[in-house]
Amino acid sequence: MRGGGLICALVVGALVAAVASAAPAAPAAPRASGGVAATVAANGGPASRPPPVPSPATTKARKRKTKKPPKRPEATPPPDANATVAAGHATLRAHLREIKVENADAQFYVCPPPTGATVVQFEQPRRCPTRPEGQNYTEGIAVVFKENIAPYKFKATMYYKDVTVSQVWFGHRYSQFMGIFEDRAPVPFEEVIDKINAKGVCRSTAKYVRNNMETTAFHRDDHETDMELKPAKVATRTSRGWHTTDLKYNPSRVEAFHRYGTTVNCIVEEVDARSVYPYDEFVLATGDFVYMSPFYGYREGSHTEHTSYAADRFKQVDGFYARDLTTKARATSPTTRNLLTTPKFTVAWDWVPKRPAVCTMTKWQEVDEMLRAEYGGSFRFSSDAISTTFTTNLTQYSLSRVDLGDCIGRDAREAIDRMFARKYNATHIKVGQPQYYLATGGFLIAYQPLLSNTLAELYVREYMREQDRKPRNATPAPLREAPSANASVERIKTTSSIEFARLQFTYNHIQRHVNDMLGRIAVAWCELQNHELTLWNEARKLNPNAIASATVGRRVSARMLGDVMAVSTCVPVAPDNVIVQNSMRVSSRPGTCYSRPLVSFRYEDQGPLIEGQLGENNELRLTRDALEPCTVGHRRYFIFGGGYVYFEEYAYSHQLSRADVTTVSTFIDLNITMLEDHEFVPLEVYTRHEIKDSGLLDYTEVQRRNQLHDLRFADIDTVIRADANAAMFAGLCAFFEGMGDLGRAVGKVVMGVVGGVVSAVSGVSSFMSNPFGALAVGLLVLAGLVAAFFAFRYVLQLQRNPMKALYPLTTKELKTSDPGGVGGEGEEGAEGGGFDEAKLAEAREMIRYMALVSAMERTEHKARKKGTSALLSSKVTNMVLRKRNKARYSPLHNEDEAGDEDEL
């Protein structure tokens, strides 16, 4: 189809050329391919209205989707020249209309020549702004304080007596507890001072009040004595303890009866105590609360501190020397001791004044590089070391407003002096005293401004010059008084998270970078505008229309009137009402051509047709005075609507879109510095240990102490079993104990003997319970019976024949001797082996005296038992018997003795 149109265009071009050669004033016909222009009459006028040029909006659409036009039949040779030219004009108009429809959004403007009614001038160069930066940058070192959430800790001593009353029922071989009553009683002040601390002993009784009645408990149900305190078996890392007894006292054993036993264990225990702000109470490590301030006392106005107890329950002792109950050593320095008795215990602790002992703020961070910058109505303290930014007011914060803040100034000065001596001593000097600011979030900043030595010398020189320039008699300006601090005090609350300061630091970091970048861009932009203003002033002389339109922001026409420009507003013309002609040659002047294409347009759709010339950038000029000599090889591209029209040899060739022409950018790339990387480090306001330790009660420590109490102050390994002899031994022991030292000595012997007997009996009993033991005992009993039988026979024999029983061998010899030799054969026998009657009589007399001696001894023994009178009576009786019973025998001769001696 495009080939057929091209042939038609060539035919039309040939005919137009022939007409032009016949009439010299007629312009040459262009070659129509793709886009065509309206034909021009031989006399230079338009032969017909050309079709509109396509708009640029549809150019890309046509490139994306190429729509083939309907196929037309090939043109047949025209019968004559006029018919061929008419057909070519119709084809050109149709093609131009199609182009106009595609580029309907292109706008044309008619700019009338300015008359000078409106004149404008260029603005003078502006003063470029400066970059927005922080003011009063100051370098220095800082100490950041936070709220002190740690409790006040101190050592305390508890004095109490554990009272245990047990009810036991005893069986024969077992015992059963019927009830156990346990209570805790406080130790009186006098006993604490005079007994425990002075001698290391404690009374065995406990006097305390229950149900508003005073009661007394006696240890072991006995009279009151002093018991020595001994160290506890188990000691913790943070405390020690002492007590008087390990074992619980059980009552004496009486079978089938209920008995009661009382145990009083005096305990002295060192514990940790803690108190939190406002220090109105404290709690012990055992979990016991004391509703009194640890700083309460009678010295230095401490009586105004809080207490919930009566005055007689509290006592303060000056010059108190504590004693170590383990080593019995006495402290070298005295203290002021507070004593408080409660219904359950007595507690003692060393009194100290409140003001220097506690502080509501504590040091958090020491920053050796802190930058202070003023932004608006606030200071911003930034540190790269901790990656945080703190925001404060411009006014300083008075330390007198901080409740219990005496440590702030002292700790701040010490830390600042230490950091300055370590890092800045040789290069900087301190400027004034430390300044204090309250930052958002409850952080108190102690800031010490620093100044380098070089700047300090410059400031000193400048100050000296100013002093030299002042008149000598000038009076110094009065110093401004510092604003008075608020008399009321407050406690600074610090947030537990520092994330807001980290975000503030990030925001300031980004803000500083962006503001720096935008500031540089603003300065560069301003300077560029000032530089371009010179170029605009020169360019307006060359093309005032373009300069004025670019400056005003809309299409205007302009011309120079000296140093000012006269401008007039351009009238827009719809693209459908503009027609471009196909020839740029001047028909009436051979060799002269138009430098820009000719156009015909209407202001309105039905308005009259106006002839003009296409200006720059779709401007429609009302005149056709843009001429130039015709040249060979002429090629031009002109903006027409949304695209370009191409003329070759001053004749229309074709139309193309702006996308078909390579674009050369006149913009300069802006090189912007990228934001540098910044790494955040973990930063905690309060550590896990500080948060755990911030509470008033440490439940772990309380549970540990409660479960360790029995292990420390009681013997859990000794077992007392049911024993029937325990009552007997207890009675004997009590009996001998009441007899004094001698009784106790005798009691030890007796108890040993009784213990041996009981042990022997117990051994026999256990031996009998064994089968082999029972058999052995049976054999022993049988042997004993046999021995008793023989002994009984011997006694009977002794009664019947004593001599035979006593002298069995002698009587046996007498029986076996010759019977004739005894008293036979007259006198010889009498003289020889017969019985001597005198000797028999003597033997009887001896037996009688032996019986008499036995009777006298028995009588005297009985008289000794009866008394002195009986003894005298016995003596008299013996004397009488001796006088009555004189000897009735004559002395024996010594013949036998002499004979015996001769035989020897």
Curated annotation (Swiss-Prot):
Gene Ontology annotations for the cellular component aspect, listed alphabetically: host cell endosome membrane; host cell Golgi membrane; host cell plasma membrane; membrane; viral envelope; virion membrane
Motif Internalization motif, residue numbers: 889-892
Region (Involved in fusion and/or binding to host membrane): 168-174, 253-260
Topology of the protein relative to the lipid bilayer: Single-pass type I membrane protein
Keywords: Disulfide bond, Glycoprotein, Host cell membrane, Host endosome, Host Golgi apparatus, Host membrane, Host-virus interaction, Membrane, Signal, Transmembrane, Transmembrane helix, Viral attachment to host cell, Viral envelope protein, Virion, Virus entry into host cell
Annotated region (Hydrophobic membrane proximal region), positions in chain: 716-769, 728-768
Spans through the membrane: 772-792
Intravirion side: 793-904
Segments on the Virion surface side according to the record's topology features: 23-771
Motif window: Golgi targeting: 849-852
Residue pairs linked by disulfide bridges in the UniProt entry: C111-C570, C128-C526, C202-C266, C359-C407, C593-C630
Residues of the signal peptide: 1-22
Compositionally biased tracts (Basic residues): 60-70
Listed InterPro entries: Glycoprot_B_PH1 (IPR035377), Glycoprot_B_PH2 (IPR035381), Glycoprot_B_PH2_sf (IPR038631), Glycoprotein_B_ecto_C (IPR055341), Herpes_Glycoprot_B (IPR000234)
Region (Disordered): 40-83, 467-490, 816-835, 883-904
Glycan-modified residues: N82, N136, N393, N425, N486, N671
Main localisation: virion
One Gene Ontology biological process: virion attachment to host cell
UniProt-annotated location(s): Virion membrane; Host cell membrane; Host endosome membrane; Host Golgi apparatus membrane
UniProt record similarity statement: Belongs to the herpesviridae glycoprotein B family.
Record's function text: Envelope glycoprotein that forms spikes at the surface of virion envelope. Essential for the initial attachment to heparan sulfate moieties of the host cell surface proteoglycans. Involved in fusion of viral and cellular membranes leading to virus entry into the host cell. Following initial binding to its host receptors, membrane fusion is mediated by the fusion machinery composed at least of gB and the heterodimer gH/gL. May be involved in the fusion between the virion envelope and the outer nuclear membrane during virion egress.
Listed name of the protein: Envelope glycoprotein B
Species of origin: Human herpesvirus 2 (strain 333) (HHV-2)
